[in-house]
Amino acid sequence: LALTTNGLGLDRRAAQLRSAGLDRVNVSLDSIDASVYATTTRRDRFADALRGIQAAAMAGLNPIKVNAVAMADTIEQVAPSLLDKSLREGWQLRFIEHMPLGAQAWSRQAIVSAQRILDIFAANGFELTELGRPDRRPAQLWQVAPTATRPGGTVGIIASITRPFCDDCDRTRLTADGQLMTCLFAQAETDLRALLRGGASDEEIASTWQQATWFKPLAHGRDAGPNAQPLNLTRRSMSTIGG
């Protein structure tokens, strides 16, 4: 069981979450530069996010996975510095192609592709060996060779736009308000909160979750059938999805 979080407040809750049965966390951290972080997130709380990550590691919520959305105006600076920091800290870094979630401005032409991210890594001296997508994970992984001054590790890229993995995706997400989403781009949601508050049994909840999973869309947001547009703009932003 994993939790997606921005890390804020995690320093106070990590141990309790671990005791409650949480296995690991995915922390959104788009830069290790405090000013870039503040601009991207619209809040000057980089130090708080970092404390949250450190507390999660101490609580045993490992491996720590760090997610960063690749943005065109910062990727040249962010990619090498964030990978270097992640390797030194033992975090598993995942870059994510910018997806059309919520009402945000988005265009396919503005995407920082997986290939461009790889090119930036190579230009900054990182030696990568492709590992593929083990166990149908969303992220395609690369092994990063160690150097005399830096440990090795892995880095992943979730290329939902330029290298979609819908054909073997088995992921579902429970949102912060109790809605089950079988795809981040899905227009339909399954209300598990109502079942929980209505006293449904574990078996009833599990059955509802299973039925929703069987009807995952064929591809990104294709709730209207196989001839629909492959990308639907969703009504939710990633910050309201959580999960």
Q: Where in the sequence are the language-model features?
A:
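Radical SAM/AdoMet-radical enzyme domain recognition
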Residues: L1-I96
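Auxiliary Fe-S-binding modules of radical SAM enzymes
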Residues: D84, R88, H98-G243
